[in-house]
Regions:
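Acidic/histidine-rich, surface-exposed loop or edge segments in extracytoplasmic proteins
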Residues: 80-98, 196-200, 214-218
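Bacterial N-terminal signal peptides
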Residues: 22-33
């Protein structure tokens, strides 16, 4: 039989161990509460995400139509087109704005060319005063760390030349979309000639991002009051835009 004093000693030791464990657990909780929370990026702490890059092309060319336009493309491919000009000869000059989603291939191309052009940090204009004026152009790049702009009439830099050609062909497409929406609403008889010109330029690879004007082309295609030849032209352009956007 175990003596009583040994039992009491055993119980006292067990209580001491439980007390020590409890104190240790409380100390761990207290130390955890005193530790600072893991740091977050400054943008997240401010409730916003890190800013992505945006490439913008602007053209100002008096006596042309439109006289002013700009196209901005962000890193996700979301595009915004703004212009000021007449949509038709007998219309008033007005501001116009539309948004679209750029094809993945051209989105990658835009940002690759911007990188090759060092995000427009250096001299871009050729400084050749003998060249004809073709409009005051600006290429700009903005992200969380940079905000650069380059002004030029003509550039000898291949990446800038390619960006200029791409943005101008996009603007031509978006202007077709603007005019088609106007003609569809007010002058349906003008649709055939307009779509015929658009088809010719598209077949000659003079237009980019045809899918960006697919909504107005679809409206024309589905309008039974429009003659069949016009609707057929709209359908062909929709298919061309879908093919290019899919990378075919």
């Amino acid at each position: 039989m175990i003596p009583d004093f040994l039992i009491r000693a055993f119980l006292i030791q067990a209580l001491r161990i439980r007390y020590a464990n409890a104190c240790f657990a409380m100390a761990v909780v207290a130390m955890t509460a005193m530790m600072p929370a893991p740091s977050m990026p400054q943008q997240a702490a401010n409730g916003s995400t890190p800013s992505a890059g945006t490439v913008t092309f602007t053209l100002d060319f008096p006596q042309s139509d439109p006289e002013h336009y700009s196209i901005a493309i962000d890193a996700s491919g979301h595009g915004r087109y703004e212009c000021t000009g007449k949509v038709a000869e007998d219309s008033e000059e007005e501001a116009y704005r539309t948004e679209f989603q750029m094809s993945a291939g051209n989105r990658v191309r835009v940002f690759s060319l911007a990188k090759q052009a060092q995000y427009f940090t250096g001299a871009v204009d050729s400084s050749n005063g003998k060249l004809a004026f073709t409009g005051a152009k600006v290429l700009s790049y903005q992200d969380g760390q940079r905000s650069n702009s380059a002004h030029y009439n003509y550039s000898n830099l291949a990446p800038v030349q390619q960006l200029t050609a791409l943005f101008q062909s996009m603007a031509a497409t978006l202007e077709y979309g603007r005019r088609l929406a106007y003609y569809h609403r007010y002058q349906k008889l003008a649709l055939d000639d307009e779509l015929k010109r658009m088809q010719t330029q598209a077949r000659n690879n003079e237009l980019s991002e045809i899918q960006s004007v697919a909504p107005v082309l679809q409206e024309i295609l589905e309008d039974s009051s429009v003659i069949n030849v016009v609707r057929a032209r709209a359908k062909e352009l929709i298919e061309m835009g879908n093919s290019v956007a899919a990378g075919h």
